[in-house]
A protein has these predicted regions:
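Acidic, metal-ligating active-site segments
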Residues: 52-53, 57-80
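A short acidic (Asp/Glu
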Residues: 61-65, 132-139, 166-167
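C-terminal edge-of-domain segments
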Residues: 64, 159-172
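Short glycine-rich, basic-tinged beta-strand/loop micro-motifs
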Residues: 119-130
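Short, low-complexity, polybasic intrinsically disordered segments
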Residues: 129-160
């Protein structure tokens, strides 16, 4: 099944609800909030890198997805914006991994011009294991091809902390 098929029911990017890690809602459209964050941090002298990742957790008949935009300040910690959504769609493990990647790419694509304009490095992180003994590895080639084919830097486990640590914390 093509990955684009997974996004048919995707929420419109402009209607997505985002929040900060402390739970405060982000009232602005996400592109405006990201631009404001970039401006604020660069005005404060920080060089930023952004990592975008998604993780999911099956909870009964629902699957919860969390997508994060992680802002790293070189040598000075970071912060993130979070979006959650739930679906009752049933996925195989491979399909779920590819839906996670598609959700991350959707956000990365919408924001990449901002990152280019402000000279911010960006990576897309996939919660996919590079070890073939893990089931998620079945999606590695497709995920890597999708992310690299879109022109984005790609990270998988164990380097994919945005998805495997940050987004994982949100869904667990």
């Amino acid at each position: 099944m093509p990955v684009s098929a997974f996004l048919v029911n995707s929420t419109n990017l402009f209607n997505m609800l985002w929040r900060k890690f402390n739970g405060d809602p982000i009232e602005l459209p996400i592109a405006h909030a990201v631009e404001n964050a970039i401006r604020r941090e660069t005005e404060n002298g920080f060089h930023l890198k952004v990592c975008i990742g998604t993780d999911s957790q099956v909870k009964g008949i629902e699957t919860e997805f969390a997508t994060v935009i992680v802002f790293l300040r070189e040598g000075h910690g970071g912060f993130m914006f979070i979006h959650n959504e739930k679906t009752r769609t049933q996925y195989s493990i491979k399909e779920r991994m590819l839906v996670e990647v598609a959700k991350s790419i959707e956000i990365a694509y919408e924001l990449c011009n901002l990152f280019t304009r402000y000279n911010v490095d960006m990576e897309v992180h996939a919660d996919i294991n590079t070890n073939p003994h893990f089931k998620s590895n079945d999606a590695l080639k497709e995920a890597m091809g999708y992310i690299l084919g879109m022109g984005f830097a790609f990270k998988a486990k164990p380097e994919a902390f945005a998805s495997s640590s940050c987004a994982n914390k949100v869904v667990n």
